[in-house]
Amino acid sequence: MLENLENLVNQEDQEDQEIKYTPRESKYCPECNGPTTSFGWCVTCETNFMKGRFPYWSSGNKDIDELIRHTQLNSSQTCDYLEWIPFEAFEMVKYIGSGGSSSVYSALWMEGPRLVWDEGLQEWTRTGPIKVALKRLDNSINITSSYVDQIKANHKLL
């Protein structure tokens, strides 16, 4: 009886260690049949999607735009890239405080990030309203390369 119990425990441990894919975590993209990474993220399709959006947004700063585009072209999962969000996309903006050379606000981002996989549409969709923190630079017209480097470092920590 003890032997049967040990066999059952070993079998359950082995089953827990097997990689199991759900349709959402398929190994292959339903669009191009290429390999996917985290939760069905297809690097090829998502890179093409983001490239197609490049002409439709700009931060107004060449260095910031290049940084955002770099993260989008090198993303390996849905929450691994930066995105330019126009100020008009935020509601309920509330001042929190200031320090150094910036001010911090809380706000509601009405669209939210692209984090939800829609099985029917077979594409990533936005979450809807989500609370976020905004940082406003006091001298944002003259963003330095050291500030861009700081953004790069913060992105690597995410």
Task: Tell where the protein language model's regions lie, with residue ranges.
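Intrinsically disordered, low-complexity regulatory segments of kinases
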Residues: M1-L158
